[in-house]
Structures are given as C-alpha cells and as structure tokens.
C-alpha cells in the first residue's frame, strides 16, 4: 500500500502488480479502504488498482448543492461537490496515476452513502469515469432524481451499480424514506437509456456490512472489465 495526502485528504493506494489495469476511486471513511480491498481479494475479481480517499468533509465535498439539515440533530449540506471534484480530477487522480507502472485501462468511481451520491453526480461533470457504484447511496437527496432525469452525462458509462439495505427506507424521516423508490426509478431510467445497470437489495439497514457491500459493487464493476 502507498499512502499520501493532498490537502486534508488522505489517499491509500493499493496498486495492481499487472500493467494497464482499471483504477477504482473510492470515497470512504478512515481505513475502510483496506477492509474493502481485503474483501475483494476474498472473492474472485480481475486485477485492479484501488485508490481510497478519506479525510472528507462529507456534507460539503460529496453534496452537489446546499440543503438545510434533514433532522433536528443533523448538519446542513453545503454543496461542495464541484469544488472537490476539481481537486479529485486536478490533483488526486494525476498523483495516483503517477504511482502506477502504466496507464489504467479505465477508471471507475465508487462510494457509500453520500459517496454514492457523489459517484453518480460526477458522471454529469466529467467523462473520466466509465463505471460507477453507488452503494447505499444517498439518492434521497432533494432534487437529485430530477437532475438526473433532465441532464446528460458527459459520457455514457459502461456499467452502473446501485445497492441499498432493504430496511433503509423504513423510517419516519420524510427525506430518507424516499431512498428506495428514488434509487429504483433512477436505476430503471438508466436501463431505459441502454446502460448496463444493476440494483441490488441487501438485508439490513444503512450501517451494516459496509466494506462487503462496497466490495460487491466494485466486483460487479470489474466483471467483463474490458
């Protein structure tokens, strides 16, 4: 593993030993990238490089626009995704790929919760990622469904993965309770556009088996990886 920092972001890089393999950019918490990488080694998947980015200001870096708190004890989202994407594309991505022995065959982007929201949103801002995984993604986020339905992606992705826990929508919170319906509709929209997409329901709530759920999404992205 190679570790380095850019600004306040920490990057844990697990490089492939083979040349010209895919790179997956994962937005995650702390040392969760290592757990995801280990989980992927326990299942069959093609060789790839994992770049796990942590040290995020989740309510800022991962959100496309500002919204007020969605519950009494919550903090507002301040809509800094575009700003952070500039750092990702302009500094983090080049530094990651300077550490590789060869150029990647393609790039994917993945994330959990708000990181899953960001993964989908990024496809509308850059054509650098040809596959994405939104794992327990925050697709309850106000107006994101309407944004997706009314805007064009920078490039049609090869694969899109969505997953949720089957209890995530069972809440009284008026925002969070929409997550499964929104995700289902977004998934069906992409399928209607000819995108190879998968929507998977897992047992449990939002905070269950996150590394394994992320690994499942990345593993599916890597299938038929050419």
What kind of region is each of these model predictions?
Residues 1-23, 48, 226:
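A domain-start/cap signature at the N-terminus of enzymes
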Residues 10, 20-101:
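Serine-hydrolase catalytic machinery in alpha/beta-hydrolase-like enzymes
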Residues 26-30, 136, 164:
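The conserved beta1-alpha1 loop
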Residues 38, 90, 120-124, 215:
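Short, hydrophobic alpha-helix immediately C-terminal to the catalytic nucleophile
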Residues 106-111, 135:
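Short beta-strand immediately N-terminal to the catalytic nucleophile in serine-hydrolase-like folds
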Residues 110-115, 119:
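Gly/Ala-rich beta-loop-alpha elbow adjacent to hydrolase catalytic centers
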Residues 128-140, 159:
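A conserved short beta-strand
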Residues 140-211, 215-221:
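The feature captures the conserved acid-bearing segment of alpha/beta-hydrolase catalytic domains
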């Amino acid at each position: 593993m190679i570790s380095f920092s850019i600004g306040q972001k920490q990057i844990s890089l697990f490089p492939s030993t083979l040349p010209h393999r895919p790179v997956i950019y994962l937005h995650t918490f702390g040392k969760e990238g290592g757990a995801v990488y280990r989980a992927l080694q326990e299942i069959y998947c093609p060789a790839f490089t994992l770049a796990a980015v942590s040290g995020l200001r989740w309510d800022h870096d991962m959100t496309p626009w500002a919204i007020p708190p969605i519950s009494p004890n919550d903090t507002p989202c301040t809509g800094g995704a575009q700003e952070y994407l500039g750092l990702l594309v302009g500094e983090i991505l080049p530094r990651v790929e300077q550490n590789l022995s060869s150029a990647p065959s393609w790039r994917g982007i993945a994330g959990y919760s708000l990181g899953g929201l960001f993964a989908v949103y990024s496809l509308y801002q850059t054509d650098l990622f040809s596959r994405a995984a939104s794992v327990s993604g925050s697709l309850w986020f106000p107006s994101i469904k309407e944004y997706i339905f009314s805007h064009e992606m920078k490039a049609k992705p090869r694969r899109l993965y969505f997953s949720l826990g089957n209890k995530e929508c069972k809440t009284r919170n008026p925002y969070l309770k929409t997550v499964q319906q929104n995700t289902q509709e977004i998934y069906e929209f992409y399928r209607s556009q000819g995108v190879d997409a998968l929507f998977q329901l897992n047992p449990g709530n939002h905070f269950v088996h996150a590394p394994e759920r992320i690994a499942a999404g990345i593993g599916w992205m890597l299938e038929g990886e050419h």
